[in-house]
Amino acid sequence: VSDLIGTELTDDIQRVRIEIGAGLVEIVPADGEQTTATLEVINGSAEDVTFKVTNGELVVELTKQFARRGPEVRVHIATPATLDARIKTGSGDISSRMPLGEARLSSGSGDIRVEQIAGSLAASAGSGDIRVGSSVGTVRASTGSGSIDIGEANDSVGVTTGSGDVRIGDAAGPTTVKVGSGDITIERIRDHSVVTSGSGDVRVELTEGPSVRAETARGDVQIGVPDGLPTYLDLKTVTGQIRCDLEPGEKPADGEPSLMLRARTVSGDITVVRV
């Protein structure tokens, strides 16, 4: 049984606060200048869900706790605005094709996909993936068994996964990545960074420093260093091999950019290449 509760047209929504179990939440661009919020409840009734706007905040939440499986709730928001968002789902996907401001997103077993964050982001998923196109502010993201993909981060980043891969495109701020079992790939590092994996490969395609620490217990480490950047190396592996393409150079002058690179692995190879 599908009960379509209705559509609310308003132009004064600045924030959304949504907490549902099963279902989905999606935010898309609007054709006009108004925000349209549509709610659909499946296997439930209108009385099961609060759906209202108060002081510029759209609120969607279940009105009671369900002993068994509750209704499936689908929330569709079309807006021209950059909304602040606090969204939590049990098993539903969260997606936004519009920029979000300050965002706190959480899902138990759904995926989180956001194209752009204008503020800061805190995102967590139990067994789903997290995808972020770009972020202006800080990013904190964690998954239990899903992957994390961040295209562009202009501020600090802290991400952790239990058993998923991590990919970051451009990391402009301080970056920390911790993975239990999975690969880490970062295309460009521009600030102090620490990346560690329990069992997986660590690959940094281009690192501009000023310091990078890359560690894995069972996996390979590969780091790309710009040609001509003075680099201090501290490389250690127990049973693997070390290959370094960098040429010995002079100590950098005072104020000259340099890189401190530390890499560790127990049973893998370490490769440092010029790029």
Regions found by a protein language model. Give the residues of each.
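Intrinsically disordered, low-complexity terminal regions
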Residues: 1-275
